[in-house]
Amino acid sequence: EGTGKATINITGGHIGIDGTDGGVVYGSARGEADDRYVMAHHAFVKESEVNVKYPTTADVADISDTSVGCITGAVHGSGENGYGYGDTHVTLHKGLIGHSLYGAGKGIGKYKKSIPILAGDNKGTLKEREIYGLLSGKVLGNTYVTMNDGLVVRNVYGGGNMTTRSEERRVGKECRS
């Protein structure tokens, strides 16, 4: 326990600058990728809800105009390397998202670990490798993505960007026009 629900309501403003790294909205915490057997503390929330409801949907041609309300990057229901312990709810009521819409988070964090070589002349020799964090951006509950109106320039995903899963989960997706 000890964690609550994170709720984000976006109703105006310009988030990010087109053509740069940034402009991304995350529904939960930013965590640290590390070996799950070594690192006992990860950043997470119990449940997250992200609502994007601009008054109007901007035109894609205006995405670099900072006076126009939009999100230039992606929207994630969970965190960047942090994870959601329960469910995520992501709803696009109206507005422009310049990248993709994800029900879960982004698992881009890596850590280094020495792993034995399994075959060949160097069998048993340890080699250092970069490994993506097992819980990075993951949602342990269900993801719910609803798009009532608006524009997503790239894709809509029920899951996350480079996240993992340890068991089969039901992903609820709903798209209305």
Predicted feature locations:
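A short, hydrophobic C-terminal helix/tail in secreted or cell-surface proteins
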Residues: 169-177
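Surface-exposed loop/turn motifs in large extracellular/passenger domains
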Residues: 1-155, 161-166, 170
